Amino acid sequence: MATLALSVAGQFAGALVGGPFGATMGRALGALAGSVVDGWLFGDKPEAPAFDIRLGSSAEGAPIPRLYGWGRLAGNIIWARELERLGGETAGAKGFGGGEEEEEIGASFAIGFCEGRVARLGRIWADGQLLDTRGLTLRFYHGDEDQLPDSLIEATQGPGNAPAYRGLCYLVVENLPLRRFGNRIPQISAELCRVVGELEPSIRAVTVIPGATEFGYDPTPRLRLVGPGQGVSENAHLAAGTSDWTVSIDELQDLCPALEHVALVVSWFGDDLRCAQCAVSPRVEAAARTVEGTSWSVAGLSRGQVPVVSTHAGGPAYGGTPSDASVLAAIADLKARGLRVTLYPLMLMDVPAGNGLPDPHGGAEQGSYPWRGRITCHPAPGRPGSPDRTGAAAAQIAAFLPGYRAMVLHYAHLAAAAGGVDALLIGSEMVGLTTVRGAANGFPFVDALVALAAEVRAIVGPATKLTYAADWSEYSGCQPAGEKFFHLDPLWASPHIDAVGIDCYMPLADWRDGDGHLDAALSASGHDLGYLGGNIAGGEGFDWFYADPADRQAQRRTPIADGAHGEPWIWRYKDLAAFWSRPHHDRPGGVRAPTPTAWVPGSKPLWLTELGCGAVDKGANQPNIFGDDKSTEGGRPHFSSGLPDGLIQRQLLRAHHRHWRDPANNPPGMLDPERIYCWTWDARPYPAFPALGEAWADGPNHRTGHWLTGRLGAMAGDELLAAIARDWGVELAAEAGAPLVGGYVVAGPARARDAI
């Protein structure tokens, strides 16, 4: 009786002090006190469970923080239900009786974090330890202004009595077992991201890598068996019981609300820069490996039927080719998320150091792990004895084609097996092959791509868009020794090709340290959006060029001109508008051909099949450069210190998106703004990648690399200031981009001036 009486009294008193939350807590405390009185009066009931409950605390009237970007925030209990028994077990020996019954007690409560809208709930900590959320019932509310009351809160409080906590980001935890927390509600904190910058909502397409990952694209968590009764996670390194793919793609969609397209990169491997000797095939990390519930297979080949990747620094130089089953599962998952899939076959070169292979470019041996764009005839064009411009060059390319065609046609069939994809690329950046000439100034590899496009079209049907991702130095033609050939025009004009694909890594800066360089007169900072945006259709590659490295060092700039025919645009790789809108006339031997090529001006849109920049000092000077110690291609941009700089990466992407959204720069039908594919997002979730060196060897490259993983959600300084101003309802003109801010919290009520 005392239990009932005191619980009612406690509920009434608590309601006077703390409203609905106080009533709930008062009732729980009253019930506990009443049970003690009942024990004094009537004695303990021997069948009653024994437990000791300590209730967590909640700060009434605590200030609500405002979050900008990423932050780990401690929660405040805003609602709680009475504790519940979840079932009991006996502590004594099984079957012998006499054991003391220990019941598990569960708590249902809501934790408020900050003002919304919060895009992403990441990891959760309880009492400072990562919380394993498997088996828990959690519901996250982003803090939308139109969010509805939680179903549990409404069921407990009654219809119409449950607050929706609109504008508040909060988490509902249902029946959390408390024994492991000392029979109390633990202190909860969470990793959150409130996106406030302009970049993330601008991103509508992105590439997903690593491309070389046997099961990394599998949405199902997999266990690799390493011994009798022993296993290690194959593809779940951050959230227990959830695949890396699921965690990573969830975060990508949370951070980029306008995302429509994902280009899924899948890699086969070449083993020689001499095209006639280059075998193209899928590869694996190890010749023997057992993964529970699945097995590796690509194009009907099993693990034991394909080469193993080379080793570097004591481990595999690459991951293996994605298993076909994992690619099909990834495509299905992306479609289920409402995303459109571009399938992106991409060659990697597995040529280790000390290979001893003759170098078509004249080196002592082929460089280690080179770029696929260096595959060419042997010797390369311009080298003594080169077969370029002869039938022998065409014969060398013909020897390369079977393996290459097998890769592309396999993924065409895989796309069809997946029920179709939105788009498929038939290659990328094969510039060393597309520019090789056969007899009579023909381009045999381009002819092969035209034929391949027709074969792929017959497999995938008319609904799948096809293109080739040309290097930024390749898409608009080649110019050997005073000549000009729009060598890819037969491909761009093919009825089976739907767009002109460009991997866009054009320089947007010529920045140096100090203020004594030429561009210092244009801007106070190399991060300035106006400066970077002005170089998208200006500066190097549009107005001028450097004839050699000595000129670059001295900043001796040669204007781009065309005195003979008044067509300077044909030499400008940055003049996308002129390339798209005008007829193309080759200039064999420097003489302008009277008849234009097959390209019809304005006939097809341009896609930026890749757009990116390394997160490195002066990255905009050479956006194509990346750091990789194992590869001879690794390096640092011109005049760069090599130090990390995530801001320049962000600013370059912002500048491009601003530029191409402007109709003055992008007339209708020219560059499809939906098809600016940012390079790149990783299926390996941050921070597991890059932190887990035992799982992935390329983690150190993330520090200055092109990854958006681990960087999206941060803010340039002007984005942060603008967001604060919006929240306070004031206008603020902020132009300076620096610094890059990962996260910022305004802890409570403050003036705009103080927050800034």
What kind of region is each of these model predictions?
Residues L238-I249, G320-L328, P402-H410, G442-A454, ...:
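Well-ordered, non-membrane alpha-helical segments in soluble/globular domains
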Residues G99-C114, Q230-P257, S310-V327, A406, ...:
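Short linear interaction motifs
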Residues P219-N235, A276-A317, G362-I397, D515-I570, ...:
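A solvent-exposed, charged loop/short amphipathic helix patch at secondary-structure junctions
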Residues K618-A722:
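Aromatic-rich peripheral "rim/lid" segments of glycoside hydrolase catalytic domains that contact
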Residues R389-A423, S428-L611, A615-N624:
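Noncatalytic carbohydrate-binding groove/subsite architecture in carbohydrate-active enzymes
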Residues V206-L225, E260-N441, L452, I459, ...:
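Substrate-binding cleft and catalytic face of glycoside hydrolase catalytic domains
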Residues R194-L199, T246-E260, V327-R337, L409-A418, ...:
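Short amphipathic alpha-helices and their capping/turn segments at secondary-structure boundaries
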Residues A2-L4, V8, T24, A28-Y217, ...:
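Polar, S/T/G-rich
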